[in-house]
Amino acid sequence: SEMCIRDRFHTVLQPISTELNQWMNADFEYNIKYPEQRIHKSASGLMVRSKSEALIATLLSHNRIPFRYECALCLGETTLHPDFTLRHPKTGAFYYWEHFGLMDFPSYRKNVFSKLQLYTAHNIIPSIQLITTYETSEHPFDSAYAEQLIHYYFGD
């Protein structure tokens, strides 16, 4: 009977893992603005815009969380490029991760809150499908906290 359970379990998981592999490896519309700012490399070789994003990408890869960097997301009339579009490895559900790394600057903060309003207007809710991390000069990015977030949202 243990064999039957394992076989049924495998049958349920196989299609989602196949879909997620295809999703991760497929071409996608990404943010083409300011490619010269992609100067930080994650452990897997992905070029990103900040050291904190490189750490997040490395943690996601290490924890086998399927993701895309700066993939286009159409919300009504507006196209955003969330830092990370993620898929839950077991359910395939979509999540988004925005790292707001320049919170010292008032104009940046204003843009952050506009972006959060746009997400919530389209039913993408912070701490439900939207993971957010923040950084200031006095409170730098905490990779241990990011690791905790990954385990909270996606399990072990």
Regions found by a protein language model. Give the residues of each.
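Short beta-strand-loop-alpha-helix junction that forms the active-site gateway
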Residues: 81, 85-115
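Acidic-and-aromatic substrate-binding clefts and catalytic sites of carbohydrate-active enzymes
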Residues: 73-79, 105-106, 136-141
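Basic, glycine-rich
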Residues: 8, 18, 120-156
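Short, small-residue-biased leader/transition segments that mark boundaries at the very start
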Residues: 3-5
